[in-house]
Structure formats: C-alpha cells, structure tokens
Amino acid sequence: MNRTVMMALVIIFLDAMGIGIIMPVLPALLREFVGKANVAENYGVLLALYAMMQVIFAPLLGRWSDRIGRRPVLLLSLLGATLDYALMATASVVWVLYLGRLIAGITGATGAVAASTIADVTPEESRTHWFGMMGACFGGGMIAGPVIGGFAGQLSVQAPFMFAAAINGLAFLVSLFILHETHNANQVSDELKNETINETTSSIREMISPLSGLLVVFFIIQLIGQIPATLWVLFGEERFAWDGVMVGVSLAVFGLTHALFQGLAAGFIAKHLGERKAIAVGILADGCGLFLLAVITQSWMVWPVLLLLACGGITLPALQGIISVRVGQVAQGQLQGVLTSLTHLTAVIGPLVFAFLYSATRETWNGWVWIIGCGLYVVALIILRFFHPGRVIHPINKSDVQQRI
C-alpha cells in the first residue's frame, strides 16, 4: 500500500474515532449547562449548526486545497477539530460549546481532503477500492469511538472530549510530519492562485453542471441513508420491542459488516462488473433490505436483512469513484468538498423529513418510511440509466474547458 494512502486512511480512522467518542456523551455534557428539559433542543441545534457550516464551507475548503495544496487545508481542519473538542472539554458556559461546533464546521474538511489526497495518488481504475477502504476506516473509527467514549465517560463527562482532542492532535502530528503533499503545484495556474471568492463559487457551479445527474444520485443515496440513521432506534423499539442492548448490538453488527463490504467488496465488484453495475448491485441489495424491513415482523429476521443493507455499502464508493474520474486532478479537492456538502445537507434535511413521515404514518403502518426509501432508489436507478456524463475537467481556463469537455 502506498504510504501516503495509508496515512490518509489512518487520518480518516482517527477523525471518525474522535467523532464517535463525543457523540454518545454530548447530551450528558449539555445537561450540565442547560438542564434535562432543554437537552434535546440544544443537541439538535448543535448538530444542525455543524452540518450547515459544512454545507457552506466544505466546497470552498476543497477548492482551497486545489489552490494551495492538501496538507495546509488538512492541518487547518484537524486543528479546528482539536480546538473544538478542547473547548468542549473545558467549557464553563454553553455558548463555548456552540463556538467549538462553529469552528469545527467551518474548518472541517478532513474527509474531503483525505479523499482528494487518495485521488491524487491512485490510478482511476482503483479509485472505487480506495474510496471503499476510506469508508471502511471511517466506519471502523465510528465503531471504536463510542466504546472508548463510554469507558472515558466513566472518569468524567469531560474526559471523552479530552480523548477526542488528543486523538485529533495525534492526527495533526501525523499529517504535519509524515503525510506528504500530493497536489502538483505546477498544475495550478496563476488564474487559480489569484481566484476571488466570486470566481470560486462560479467555478463550483461550472463543475457541477456536467455532473448534475450523478450528483443527484449521490444526494438521493445519502438521503436514504438518513432513514435508518434517524429511525432505527424508534423502529426497533416499536416493531420488535428491542431494548437498548439489542439496538446497540444491531448497530454494531451493521457497522462492522458495512465496513467489511466497503473495504473488501466494493473494489472487487467494481473491477469485475464496472462501476455502474456495482452501483446498481448496491442499490438493489439495499433496496431489497429496506423492503424487507417494512414487512418483517420477527426480531431474528433483521439479521439476514442487515447483510443486504451492508452489501448496499458498495454503492457510494463506486459512485464516488465514477464521479472522481470525470474531474481533472486540479479539481479533486473542489469535487470532494461538494460531495461533503451534499452529505451534510442530507444530514440536515433527512432527519426532519423522515421523522415527520414516520410520525405521520406510524399509526396506520410503521413500514411506510422504508417503502419511501425504495421509491427513492427507483428514481436513482432511472437517473443512473439515462444520464451519461462526459469527462470534465475543472475550468482552469476557457480554452482548456473547450478541449476537454
């Protein structure tokens, strides 16, 4: 394995571990500042604040990494996360928590820059494999993080945030001393180096246009992923009378199998079937899993369904790979920033929409929300079938655009 790729994957793992450490204990920290009655409201606002900052700033940071290099932006992002966790660990008033989340949201480009780094140093035909490995490392970090956070939380409610700050500080040092710059500065034109904010937003729109169909599919798939993320606990309790232990075990099994499929199967299937067919296989597997969730009535039936849902994990790496090869090397940061922005946009919209739909339909049948997910997959397959984008290159200058589109 290329050392640069390995370091990028380690950074992704550490970043996800930091997130996983703090999320289960954040409500407990909030309770110390706002009281039990206002925890849910403040928790939701903190999550939404971070996500909205990512929606706005991730494409700009990605574009910035195309201009000045991957390492400086990655270091800024890791420093922002470290500062966020340190502020949370030492906060004495609630507004400091909001300040920390604001800083982390504005500077948070770790995933986008790590993906750009991988795209810089891997051949096009193996992108799906490495994007799958990236997803697997993120999933592994999200599995390990809550375990560490749970044990650290036994020390104090602030201890998990100190651990998260230390882990992100470690990732910062790895990036500073070991990770090499992968972006070729010779490919950056003077026009790009001196680009204004208006020109940056214009260039983002120009890049999005030829990829609009694939980006819509990406958005739909990420949006569908918000259904179980939002409703798994409620659905398990109501349909199968699960307690907290069963919910936790099911999430752990799904997380592990999902990571294995992304890391081991995504690249293999894409290599033998091609990215488009790999995407279709993933959509069909996940769609069947959603349909079965809607109709099954026994708790034991969930476990084979989880394998289908895990197989759906090959979809996003294959889609990310097929989008990545349609964008020139000089615009990988911008592209990955746009994908990060779309991902966080679904994290804002999805819970609101699907929680409302579930609440509105649960009295008649609490399986409707999974059927809606299947319907969205049908839309994604139709777009995938009829949308055929050509190869695009980020518009460094107009003559280059005309030659390459």
UniProtKB/Swiss-Prot annotation:
- Report the GO terms under cellular component: plasma membrane
Highest taxon of the lineage: Bacteria
Instruction: Kindly list the residue ranges recorded as spanning the membrane.
Output: 6-27, 42-62, 74-94, 102-122, 131-151, 159-179, 215-235, 245-265, 278-298, 299-319, 337-357, 364-385
Predominant location category: membrane
Keywords on record: Antibiotic resistance, Antiport, Cell inner membrane, Cell membrane, Hydrogen ion transport, Ion transport, Membrane, Plasmid, Transmembrane, Transmembrane helix, Transport
Please name the Gene3D superfamilies in this protein's record.
MFS general substrate transporter like domains
User: What is the annotated role of this protein in its UniProt record?
Assistant: Resistance to tetracycline by an active tetracycline efflux. This is an energy-dependent process that decreases the accumulation of the antibiotic in whole cells. This protein functions as a metal-tetracycline/H(+) antiporter.
This chain belongs to the protein called: Tetracycline resistance protein, class E
